[in-house]
A protein has these predicted regions:
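Predominantly five- to eight-bladed beta-propeller fold
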Residues: 22-37, 47-103
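Residue-level signature of beta-propeller blades and closely related beta-rich strand-turn architectures
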Residues: 7, 51, 132, 184-185
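Extended, regular secondary-structure scaffolds
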Residues: 6, 15-19, 42
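Short loop/turn segments that connect beta-strands within beta-propeller blades
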Residues: 14-17, 94-98, 144-148, 194-196
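Short beta-strand segments
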Residues: 18-20, 99-103, 138, 151
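Glycine-rich, acidic and aromatic/proline-enriched surface loops and short helix-turn segments
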Residues: 7, 89-97, 147, 184
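Conserved beta-propeller blade repeats
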Residues: 1-2, 27-45, 74-82, 86-89, ...
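Short, solvent-exposed loop/turn and secondary-structure capping segments
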Residues: 3, 12-15, 48, 55-61, ...
Length: 196
């Protein structure tokens, strides 16, 4: 069992009912989130570490509310163009050795969002998808579970816009091949990508 406590990652050996700390560097504004994925062999754990930002509140006025005649002032958290965004970094832990496997964080610069998308069936790697700020680059990558090395599987780039919310990916034979939808030539096509 793995969980976030005091901004860090802990695991509990259910059989022995013992708690172990895996990370010690999590703080309030740079913490390990609850977004995590166990490797199928339960020997590794992938987690997202988040560098948070302060709220940026803007006022909104509901001019004609149904409930009353007077306008209602509301506040919303809203990032404006150019504002600093949260940073999401993947982290990898070896459960047996109770230590973190370092990853090269330069790969994740200038990001809009990053999300874990699962592990390979044989536990050799976990995948994530990375959307660069500006939405002109979208990367599907895998992280080697032993070395922490990062390999780009798909690097979708466009001078205008990558439709990140309409993407489709399906891994065949545990990632040996990948079905991927892209508009890289101006038309929406299904591509078969070599995952090796």
């Amino acid at each position: 069992e793995a969980y976030n406590k005091d901004n860090n990652i802990y695991v509990r050996d259910v059989a022995e009912d013992k708690e172990y700390v895996l990370s010690r560097d999590g703080i309030k504004d740079f913490y390990y989130s609850g977004e995590m994925a166990w490797s199928p062999d339960s020997k590794k754990l992938a987690v997202i570490k988040v560098r948070d930002i302060p709220e940026r509140r803007i006022p909104l006025i509901e001019s004609s509310p149904v409930s009353q005649k007077q306008p209602i002032l509301q506040w919303r958290d809203y990032a404006k163009p150019g504002d600093v965004l949260p940073v999401y970094l993947p982290a990898l832990f070896n459960i047996e050795q109770k230590q973190q496997i370092p990853l090269d964080t330069r790969f994740f610069e200038n990001q809009f969002y990053l999300q874990l998308t699962g592990w390979r069936e044989d536990s050799r790697a976990f995948m994530f998808e990375f959307n660069q700020r500006g939405h002109q680059r979208y990367i599907v990558a895998e992280v080697d579970a032993e070395t922490g090395g990062i390999r780009s599987l798909i690097d979708e780039q466009s001078p205008t816009f990558v439709y990140y919310n309409r993407n489709f990916r399906y891994d065949l034979e545990d990632g040996k091949e990948i079905l991927w939808i892209s508009e890289r030539d101006g038309w929406r096509h299904l591509y078969l990508i070599d995952g090796n």
